[in-house]
Amino acid sequence: MAMNLKNSSSGGNLTSSPSYNSFSSLNLSGNSFNNGSGSGSGSGSGSNEYIPLCFSKDVFTSNTFEVDQFISDCRKRVNLESVQKDLREYSKHLDSELIELINKEYQSFFSLSTSLVGFDTILNEFSISQSSIKSEIKSFNNEIVKVRGLVEDKLNEKKSIEQKKKLLQLYISISETLNNMNHLFDQLYQLTHPNDFKKINNNNNNHTNNETNINDGDVLELLIDRISNSFYQIQNQMSSLTNDELKFNIFQSLSLKIMDLSNKIEEKVEPIFKESLKRFINVNNNNKEIVDDNNEKQNKYDERILLVCLKTFQTIDKLNVPYKLFKTLIVKPRLAQIVSLRNLEINKSTTDGLSQIYNSIIEFLKNQCSSFFDISNLINNNLKEKQSNNNNNNNNNNNNNNNNNNNNQINNNSNNNNNNINNNNINNNYNNNIILYNNYNFISQSVLPEIDESLGFFKQIFATGIPDLFYKNYYLTFNFIQSIEVNFLTNKELLTQFRQSSSYSSLWKKWNFAVYFQLCFTNIAQHFEFNYLRIPLFDQLTLPTNNITNNNNNNNENNNEFYLKSTDGLRLSMDKCWSNSNFIFDLSSKFFKLFLQLIARYDTFISDTLIPLELELQQQLQQQQLQQQQQQQQQQQNIGDSVIKITPKSPPSLSNQSPISSSTTLNNKQSSPENFIYIISDIYKIKSKISTNYKELIIKTIGNHQNQHEILNLINDGILESCKTLEQLIPRISIIIENHLISKCLEPIEIISTLRSTYRMTNKPVPTKPSIYVSNLISPLEILINNKASSLHFIPPEIKLNWAISVLTPVTESFKNAATNLIQSVTQSNDIINKMVKKSKPTTTTSGGDMSDMDKISLQLYLDVDKFGLYIQKFGINLLTFEPFLGLKSIVEPFKKLILNQNK
C-alpha cells in the first residue's frame, strides 16, 4: 500500500516509498495521520494521506519529551531503520503542511512583509528617545539622592540637638528637684528640732496643746511623703537615661548627689521612724489594759508616720534600716525576756519550758507586733497595685506606639524620622520608668534571725542523746514555725521568702537529723534483732489449742494475730517507723528504707531456717535416686527366680519413688509440716498488711507534696518488691511440706504387693470393699489440708490445691507402678504354674465361686483405685484432667467387667 503527499498549490508531489509489511506501517497508539476523511489517494481538495507511523505525533509536544527515552521506547517495538524512515516521512509531511498553510494565507503573508517596510527606522528613533529619557531620569535620581542625604544630615543634627536639649531639660529638672528637697530638709529640720520634736512627742502629757501637736504631726507626715515622692521622681527621671547617657559628666555628678541624698534621707527619717516605732508598739501593748482617746489619736498618728517612713525606706531601697531597728528595738529585748534558761528549765536539766517559750513568742507577735505587720502588708499591697498599673500602662503605650508606627509609614521620610525619634523616646521613658522594689518581710528578716540566735545559746534544745526528747523539741519547734507561717505569712511570696531565708536554713541545720536517725535505727533494729530474731524460728510458734470451737478459734486469732513472735515483732518495728513519736518528714526516705530493711531481715531470718532443711532434703533425694537405681538393677537380675517360686516372698518396694524416712527428714518435731503451715499463714497476713494498711499509713504520714506522683511510684515499687520477696518463701516452704507428705503417703504403698499373698491359694471370698491402705494413702494429706490448713483463712485455696496436686501426683504414679508390677508378677506366675501342671485343672479357684485368684486380685485393685479416685476428688481435683489418675484408671478399667459378672 502506498500513499501520495501532494502539494496542490505548486503542482509538485512528495511520494512515499512503497508499502512494506513491518511494524513501522502501523500506528501503535491507534491513530493514523490523515487530513481527510477517506482512505484513498489525495484529491483536489488538498487532503493528504501517508503511511501510519510507529509513534504518535503528540509525543513531540509533550513537556516530558526526551530524545533518549523516545528512541528507547521505539526500539522496543521496531528497529532503528524503521524509526529513521518514519521520522523522515513525518518531516516531509510537516514540510508539506507548512507549504499548504503559506499558500492558503499568502495574501496575509505578503501584506505583512509590505507593512514592515520602514519599521526599522521607527525603532531606531524610539531607541534614541528612550536613551535620552533614561539619562535624564538617572541625573534626576542623583539629585534626589544628594538632597535626601542633606535632609537626613539635617534631621540627624536636629535629632541630636533635641536629644541634648532633652538631657539638659532633664538635668535642670533633677537639679530643681534636688533644690526643692533641700528646702524640704530644712523644713523637716525646723519641725524636728529637738525642742519642737520633744513637743510633738509629748502628746500624752500636754492635753491642752494636743490638737496643735497633731497638726504638726500632719505636717511632718506630709514632709516625709513629699521627700519620698521627690526621690521617686528623681529615680524615674534617671531611669529614662541610657547607659551611654549616664556616662556623661553631668549625670555622673548627679548620681553621686543622689547617693548622698539617699543617705541624707536615711539620716533624717531614721530617728523619726525609731521614736514612732517605740511609741506605736508601747501604745499597742498598753491599749490592752487602758483605752482612751489620747492613746487612740497617738496610735493613729504613729501609724501614719510609720507608713510614710516605711514607704520612704522602700523608695531609697534601704529596707535593712527598718529591719535592723525593729529587730534591735522591739524583738531583741522581748525575746531576751522570753527565751531564758529559767523559762526553759522548769525542772532542772530539762527543756520542759520550750513549749511555753514558743507560746509566749506567738503571743508577743500577735498582741504587740501584728498592727505593725499590717502596716508593712499595706505597703506591699500598694506596691503590688502600683507595679500592676505600670505594667498595664506600658502595654497600652506599646500598643499605641505600634499603631502610630503603622500610620507613620504612609507619611513622608522626614515625618517618619521625627515620629520615630519621638516614639523611641516615649518607649524608653515607659520602659525604664518601671522600678521594682522589694516587699517588706519583717518575720523573715527581723523576727526569725533573732529567734534563731536566741535558741542557739541553748544547746540542750537540739541535743540528740535522748531520741524521745529530741523528737519532742523538734516537733514543738516545727509546730511553732508552722504557727508563724499560718498567722503572719498569708502571702505566698512572703512565705517563699521566709523559707528561703538564711535564718530558716540555719534553724533547721541545728537539728542533727543524722544522729537522731542513727539512734532510732539502733533502737528499732536492735530491738527487733535481739528480742525476736535470736530465738529459733520454731521456738517462737504459739500454736492454737485443739479443743476450741470455730468461733473461739476466730477470737483467738484476733487476740493473737500472728503465730510467730518474729512476725509480731516485725509489725511493732514497722509501726515505730511511722509513729508520731519517731517519724520526721526530713527523714522520710531513711525511715522508708528502714521499713524495707526490716521486711528484708524478716525474710532472711525465715530463709536461713529453711536452708539446712532444704540441703537435708536435697541429700535425701539424691540418696533416694541412688537406691532406686540399685533396686531396679537388682530386680532385673532376680526377676527370673522371683517368678519361678510358687509362693514368693513379698518383693521390695515397687514404687518408683521410695518414701523418705520420716525419722531423717524432719527429726525435730517442732519443724513438722503442720508448723510450717502457721509460718505460711503469718507470711500471708503480714504481706497483706504491708500492701494495704502500711501502704496507706505511709502515704498519709508523708502527706501531699510537689513530687507527689514520683513519691507514690517509689512507695509502690518498694512495697511491691518487698511483697514479692516474701512470696518467694511460699514455694520453698511448700516443697518441704510436700516432700514430707509424699513420704508419709507412700508408706502404705508396699501393702499393694501383699494382695498377691492375700488371695493366692487362700480361698478368700470375692472382694466387695476397697482395702484399708487406700485411706492411709490420703490420710496425711487430708489431715494437713482439711484439718490444719482449713482453720487458717489467710492461706489461699489455690495454695492448698497446689499442695494436693504436688503430693498426689507422685503418690498416684507410685500406685500405678505398684499395681502394674503386681499384675505382671501374678500373670507371669500363673503362666509358669499352668505350664508345670500342664492340662490339670488350676487350683486357684475358690469355694465361693468360679472366680480365679487372678480375678480376685484384679477386682480388689479396681475397687481400691475407684476409692482412691473418690478421695482425690475431695481435694477439688478434676479426675478428667488429672493425668496420673487417668493412667492408673486405664490399668484397672478392664477389671470392671468382673463386677458386672459377679452381679449376674
From Swiss-Prot:
Subunit details: Component of the conserved oligomeric Golgi complex which is composed of eight different subunits and is required for normal Golgi morphology and localization.
Matches recorded under InterPro entries: COG2, COG_complex_COG2_C, COG_su2_N
Domain of life the protein comes from: Eukaryota
Membrane topology value: Peripheral membrane protein
Listed GO biological process terms: Golgi organization; intra-Golgi vesicle-mediated transport; protein transport
Low complexity bias locations: 388-424, 652-663
Natural source organism: Dictyostelium discoideum
Major location category of this protein: Golgi
Role this protein plays: Required for normal Golgi function.
Annotated GO CC locations: Golgi membrane; Golgi transport complex
Descriptive protein name: Conserved oligomeric Golgi complex subunit 2
Keywords, ordered alphabetically: Golgi apparatus, Membrane, Protein transport, Transport
